Amino acid sequence: MTKSTNSYWNPLHPESREQWQPIAGMEDLAEELTLSIDPDTGEYTRLTRFHAGADTTAFGEKSHEYPEEIFIVSGRLFDQAFDMWLESGHYASRPPGEVHGPFKTDVGCVVLEISFPNRTE
């Protein structure tokens, strides 16, 4: 099986608003929209939108046993693990186990994430 496919559409357009889902436990802070997923491997591409003023400090830092790539689409996000503001255009290819977060944003932020949960080391 391969990742799901879609024709051109704009997930950031107001008409697509109803497709975004609150992230469990972070309903007032962030929401997500899965763009594509491979049901066999679990590989997925999704957008995460952090609302203006969001602060995930209470959730602590994160790491995964698999690699992921992130790209800041809009806004800015502070990654406390790196003591760095990530702004529109920033990109990272994270290896398995890399610690990131917690995050906070003053103006809001949209992050494109491509994850490979089947590629654990």
Specify the residue positions occupied by each region the protein language model found.
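A short, N-terminal "cap"/entry segment at the start of jelly-roll beta-barrel domains
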Residues: 1-44
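Ligand-binding loop in jelly-roll beta-barrel domains
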Residues: 28, 96-121
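Conserved short histidine dyad/triad with adjacent acidic residue
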Residues: 33-64, 83, 95-99
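Glycine- and acidic-residue-biased ligand/ion/polar-headgroup-sensing regions
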Residues: 58-80
